[in-house]
């Protein structure tokens, strides 16, 4: 199961053990773990075509996702951005691949992303998508997503290529190997006009303002990061607090921001935080949760206590299922149902 989980497109594996097997008495002979097999083959001609397209671009943009979080993929991606001066935007699952403060990092894209990234997607002429699946949180309208761009998609899973958004060139392969093969073929160049546009948009990005009368989300996230430092591991549950953490956490490296994408499973954070702490016992591990998520799985505190696993739990308590309530406000005429967690009052506190 672990070998399968770490092979090809990495992901969870269900181990389903029937009850009769759990009750049986049998001999156990340990097997030597099989080597992890990763798909590394790719079409070299397609890589050359991709490099030619990138070399001819005036407004190139890299859009990357969780598929490039492995250490082997991060460096060639950063090298590509630097060599060809290509700005990059990313999904929730890829936070930290390109460090905060890197001039080529223009922020998270999509529904919960920043103005600059979404504007860059709309205006780029070449989009290089690496290890990402064009989810509905990014490509809200697949027919108009990056409609002015030639789209190149690189993914280890062939079934993801062109699945949600039509692409012009698709490359099946491990991102690390494909990017390393592409690097010598991509020309070193500058895009002054394109970067000028990027900087103008960045001036219009939303920047939260502190309010002396109440504690604001960015202040909480900022102080947690200041106290725990960039080497800590930050885990989040699912909801508004998750997006605040993604937006305001000043990440420096991959795998220091752990969250649940895709299914968005509430209650994920506490168990993941315990697991992360077991993996890096000498590193501070913090779980950022909402009061709704905390209620989903707070029994795991007993696990942490029983095994003496020291974790830090930060709970945003607004007495509501905040993200669901936000959608009820925006799309359902403020018809609130089952989202208030403060039962003595009809509405949550701010």
Task: Provide a role label for each language-model segment.
Residues 1-30, 50-53, 118-152, 181, ...:
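Structural signature of the thiamine diphosphate
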Residues 17-22, 66-68, 95, 158, ...:
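Glycine-rich beta-alpha junction loops
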Residues 19, 94-197:
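Glycine-rich, acidic loop regions that bind phosphate or pyrophosphate groups
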Residues 19-42, 194:
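Aromatic-enriched
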Residues 118, 162-164, 170-172, 176-182, ...:
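Thiamine diphosphate
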Residues 199-277:
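Active-site diphosphate/adenylate-binding microenvironment
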Residues 346-350:
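A short, hydrophobic C-terminal helix/tail in secreted or cell-surface proteins
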